[in-house]
A protein has these predicted regions:
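Basic/aromatic-rich interaction segments and small domains that mediate binding to polyanionic partners
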Residues: 25, 31-82
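A short, charged, amphipathic alpha-helix used as a generic interaction element across diverse proteins
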Residues: 77-80, 119-138
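Short, structured interface segments
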Residues: 79-99
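Short, mixed-charge low-complexity intrinsically disordered segments
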Residues: 136-153
């Protein structure tokens, strides 16, 4: 089911995999540049952060961040690709999956922001990941059954 950027911001849980599309048809493979541009506008990622709207002298709309992937080799990340969307974005979004009940989210929090760092199968795996990566402000949150049912609908 396609939805709006505002709905993703309001309803999708951290860790959800989200696909975004602009509604244009995919060009044939032989048109390399057109296909590359289309892939930039039509992709997917994991919801890692929400930022509230800014107020004051230079207001800005609320945003959310989708993590598209990491690039590197030998277990070393060289480049991490994320994309920020404003809630007024005109593309269509679709939640393709959410973390299952019992999954553990490693979350870093500061002020009124929460950023997802990792999704693990359970608390023990999340604690191991946290020990290996050493984020000092991070904590583990367990995904509940009710939250998953509400967000996946």
């Amino acid at each position: 089911m396609n939805t709006t950027a505002q709905s993703i911001y309001d309803e999708a849980p951290l860790g959800a995999h989200i696909r975004f599309i602009d509604g244009t048809p995919r060009p044939p493979e032989r048109f390399k540049r057109k296909l590359s541009a289309w892939k930039e506008r039509n992709s997917a990622g994991q919801l890692t952060q929400r930022s509230p709207a800014g107020t004051g002298s230079s207001p800005c709309p609320a945003t959310f961040t989708l993590h598209e992937g990491n690039f590197g080799s030998g277990g070393i990340v060289i480049l991490s690709v994320s994309r920020i969307f404003v809630v007024t974005d005109q593309r269509r979004f679709e939640v393709t999956s959410v973390p299952p009940p019992g999954a553990a989210l490693v979350v870093q929090a500061w002020d009124d922001h929460r950023e997802l760092l990792h999704v693990a199968q359970d608390r023990a795996a999340a604690e191991v990941w946290l020990q290996q990566h050493g984020y000092h402000r991070a904590h583990v949150e367990i995904v509940g059954e009710a939250e998953t049912l509400i967000k996946a609908a």
